[in-house]
């Protein structure tokens, strides 16, 4: 999924009017950070506030804090519109979307372009996404570009389906086993 983000001064002000969740590359529990109008100027106050509240994990100038904060707000808002469809993700967009889903189960289809069983599962996976509106359905092309994420998630065969809840992997289905996938999703929905 390629996310296009266009920010004007007004959109920055709107997205930064309320608290945001800070970016944490280690994916530890998110921290709340308040940014105000000083961030619009890229002033030192915003950068200082960000460093004081978040600590050394985030090394950014005030202006880049604004952009990152606005991006995170956009990703959080976008995760609400992900229901009812399958969304293509990559190594940069997967974790923000998965963590932004809150209590909704997230199902990640890890596939390759050349995989026959992956192609068989794709329309069935799409039907599930249209039917189960309380679940976020994602797919990741396990190409060279996304290899670091595939390795992090422990993929060994394609297709592999990872089921996450609360940003943590709760189940895995390997191969084109549709019935097992449905059962794993139902278990995640009811937990």
UniProtKB/Swiss-Prot annotation:
Subunit annotation: Forms a complex with heterodimeric ferredoxin-thioredoxin reductase (FTR) and ferredoxin.
Family the entry assigns: Belongs to the thioredoxin family. Plant F-type subfamily.
InterPro entries: Thioredoxin-like_sf, Thioredoxin_CS, Thioredoxin_domain
Official protein name in the record: Thioredoxin F-type, chloroplastic
Record-annotated site: Contributes to redox potential value: 116-117
Domain of life: Eukaryota
Any one GO CC term of the record: chloroplast
PANTHER family: THIOREDOXIN-LIKE PROTEIN 1 (PTHR46115)
Site features described as Deprotonates C-terminal active site Cys, chain residue numbers: 109
Organism: Mesembryanthemum crystallinum
Gene3D superfamilies in the cross-refs: Glutaredoxin (3.40.30.10)
Cell compartments where the protein resides: Plastid, Chloroplast
Keywords, in A-Z order: Chloroplast, Disulfide bond, Electron transport, Plastid, Redox-active center, Transit peptide, Transport
Active site: 115 (nucleophile), 118 (nucleophile)
Pfam families: Thioredoxin (PF00085)
CDD domains from the UniProt entry: TRX_family
Disulphide-bridged cysteine pairs: 115-118
Residue ranges constituting the Thioredoxin domain according to the UniProt record: 68-190
Main function: Participates in various redox reactions through the reversible oxidation of the active center dithiol to a disulfide. The F form is known to activate a number of enzymes of the photosynthetic carbon cycle.
Keyword flag Disulfide bond: yes
């Amino acid at each position: 999924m390629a996310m296009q983000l266009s920010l004007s001064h007004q959109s920055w002000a709107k997205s930064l009017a309320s608290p945001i969740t800070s970016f944490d590359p280690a994916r530890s529990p998110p921290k709340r950070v308040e940014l105000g109008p000083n961030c619009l100027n890229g002033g030192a106050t915003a950068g200082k506030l960000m460093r004081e509240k978040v600590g050394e994990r985030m090394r950014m100038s005030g202006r880049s804090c604004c952009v990152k904060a606005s991006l995170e707000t956009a990703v959080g808002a976008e995760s609400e519109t992900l229901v009812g469809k399958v969304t293509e993700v990559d190594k940069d967009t997967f974790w923000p979307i998965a963590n932004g889903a809150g209590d909704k189960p997230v199902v990640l289809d890890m596939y390759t372009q050349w995989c026959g069983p992956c192609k068989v599962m794709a329309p069935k996976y799409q039907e599930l996404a249209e039917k189960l509106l309380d679940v976020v359905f994602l797919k990741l092309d396990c190409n060279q570009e996304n290899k670091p994420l595939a390795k992090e998630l422990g993929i060994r065969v394609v297709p592999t389906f990872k089921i996450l809840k609360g940003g943590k992997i709760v189940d895995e289905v390997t191969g084109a086993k549709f019935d097992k996938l449905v059962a794993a999703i139902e278990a995640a929905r009811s937990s």
